[in-house]
Swiss-Prot record:
Catalytic residues, chain numbering: 117 (proton donor/acceptor)
Disulfide bond annotation, renumbered to this chain: none
SUPFAM superfamilies in the cross-refs: Trimeric LpxA-like enzymes
Key words of the record: Acyltransferase, Cytoplasm, Lactose biosynthesis, Repeat, Transferase
Primary localization class, coarse: cytoplasm
Transmembrane in keyword set: no
Reaction it catalyzes: a beta-D-galactoside + acetyl-CoA = a 6-acetyl-beta-D-galactoside + CoA
Protein name listed in UniProt: Galactoside O-acetyltransferase
Residue numbers marked as site, Transition state stabilizer: 87
PANTHER family, per the entry: ACETYLTRANSFERASE YJL218W-RELATED (PTHR43017:SF1), GALACTOSIDE O-ACETYLTRANSFERASE (PTHR43017)
A GO cellular component entry from the record: cytoplasm
Amino acid sequence: MPKLESYKRVHTEELYFPNDQKLWKEQQEALVLLEKFNQTSVTQPEQQMELLKKMFSEIGENCFIQPPFYANFGGKNVHFGTGIYANFNLTLVDDTDIFVGNHVMFGPNVTIDTATHPVSPDLRKRGAQYNKKVYIEENVWLGAGVIVLPGVRIGKNSVIGAGSLVTKDIPDNVVAFGTPCMVKRKINDSDFKTYDHGKKIDLDEFI
């Protein structure tokens, strides 16, 4: 019987057992860096960024993650663009790749999940899982408490309302919310002129 090499199946959407020793060693090393990041003072932004560059697969400039921050593999499979802001308790179940575009905003308590399990109880009791990559495109805003499930893609510029459960792809340039998350409307011209139920945007005169 051939030996199952679980570490080769992590990024392929195939079933595997995560107790593979090679995977466990990689995870331990990543979690040590994550622990250091969460213990770093807010007065040490340079040290925080230095740690994030070691932790993440990719991370651009001007990114900020408010501790505490959680990730299964400490960010090892996370690809961040530039100018990303994440409020506290961002949770990335990064068993496979999570791609986040430039200028994405995460509210507090957002969860991005790539790992899932088969329905079969026999397989689940043995710990079997498989992973599906998640894509958050540029300029997306995820409100507080949003949960994004494995395999989802959220299109650029879209807004996901607080508390939403995103189970399917969301297109570009829409406002969507709910459980399950559904598109409510498109982003339109008035959104560039007003905010909060019709208040005029007046920031241009200060820029």
